[in-house]
Amino acid sequence: MAKTTNGKFWNDECEKVSDLLWKPNLIVNHKPQERINFKCDNKYITFNYYSNNVPINDQLKFKDIPQSNNTDKKNKLMDKLLKIEDSRYKKDIESNKTRKIKLTKEQLTAKHNTQLLKIQNKISQLDGFIRSRRIQLLPNDFQKNIFNIWFNETTVIYNRLLTEFTQYYIKFKEIASDNKELVKLLRTNEEFPLSLQKLRNLKIHDIINIYLEDQLIHKLETPFCVIANTIKEFVANVKGNLTKLAENKIDKFTFKHKNFNGKIRTISIDSKYASENSFYPDKLGKLLQTYEDLKGFSWKNVKHDFKIVYDKYNNKYYAHIPKYVYRNLNILNKKPITVMDPGERTFQTLYGLDHVISIGDNLRETISKRLLRIDNLKSKLDTPGSKKHNLKLNRKTRVRKCRYKKAIDRHHKKIEHLQRELHYKTAIYLCENYQRIMVTDFSSKKVSSKDGDLDAMSKRILGKISHYRFRQRLQQKCEEFNCQYLEVNEAWTSKTCCNCGYIHAKLGTSKIYDCPKCKQKRDRDVNGAINILLKNRKLVLMEDQ
């Protein structure tokens, strides 16, 4: 075991590896290079690349990246599906002998070959990942009206199911002695079964005859497939909460009805109803244009069930279509590793052995301006005495307050779009340029707790940046680009000197790490990123280092 010398993680091995690393001194006077391969034109997302053109030390030997092997899984699934298909094929041949209109041998063989091809496609999908693609729809007025009818009718159905289930929940809660007994009573209730097929068969006539009559909807316009998917969504939501309740992860769960005026409204569509240029062509027409038509999108290529989403704020319709994405193995000349130090002043500081990158240096200023505008607009909405005054609001005041609310939503959307672009552009850049990506378990939730020493604005900014969501998105991209994703702990990496291991107890919020022991000065975030690598070196470096 290595002997500890200074820091909480620092030892002789850390010092040995540290001597092999390029440790840049203060980079504030270095001229940043151009945006190397960073495909982002947003002026609010800065990208600064610093390098002294120092080659990576040849003595740094990295472990091989573990590759996922699905061979055993593929073989098991192949054997299972082939047995099922062989059995079906034999039964088909036997039953064909007694048919009045018999199929030819060529027809039976063609059907068998089609099934074998489907099995082969299913096996190949084990090498891929399901990802959702968002397609903007361009419906005409008639199609918009149809969508709105479907949204309203499915909302009525969902809310009525929820109301009925709530009655049983309250009834059984009074009888049950604990949560497990309550869950058992709800799951075994034959009057309101929590099986999709049973509930659908039991309630489908009530939906047609009772649910919609209460809302003065006399003719059901929504296809049965969409209604069935609404019931499926309801059952999935209830079952998920009941599982948590049985495991005592929650004490109770509230029943929230869907809002007819919600900002986001969704319905689910089965892929089998998609035609060449639309879906449900008998109801929507033979052509449903999309924003992606010029980029080669075609409805006939839709192979999985999808969702139609209406964004009320933007007044736009989208189709969220799942598809299989396979690993991109064609990118060569990647750097061996990058280590990331997250923050609030700078979104990410990257250390790549021979270069340093900072992404999102001015995000605090950009986001804080939006948040202050939101606070200002909210103060106008919640002026003292406004509750009494609101009883006799005139039309002009109502219009003004409505504009304030829209402006607040607009600022939130601007921040959300900035966050989304920042996350995805950064993730794609990392995956295209590095073999291994080391991130920290930096949690905005922990930072925003009452015990933290950050001011209120910093906590709000960290919440909007959402490092946790970025890690989720980055992990997905690492799967697609065949990169090794490493999530590690960053404790004591900021206060420890990456050159000598001294712990700077009085570092505070300083941007510069000025080591009192070895007298070296460097950027605080760069020092932290190097220490993250040193602390977790055994995950990526060979044992002899």
Curated annotation (Swiss-Prot):
Q: Among its keywords, does the record have Kinase? A: no
Query: At which positions is Zn(2+) bound?
Result: 497, 500, 515, 518
User: What Gene Ontology terms describe what this protein does at the molecular function level?
Assistant: DNA binding; metal ion binding
Q: Which InterPro entries match?
A: Cas12f1-like_TNB, Recombinase/Transposase-rel
Q: What Pfam families does the record point to? A: Cas12f1-like_TNB
Source organism's superkingdom? Viruses
UniProt family annotation: Belongs to the transposase 35 family.
Query: What name does UniProt use for this protein?
Result: Putative transposase R104
Look up and give the organism this protein is from: Acanthamoeba polyphaga mimivirus
Q: What is the lineage of its organism?
A: Viruses, Varidnaviria, Bamfordvirae, Nucleocytoviricota, Megaviricetes
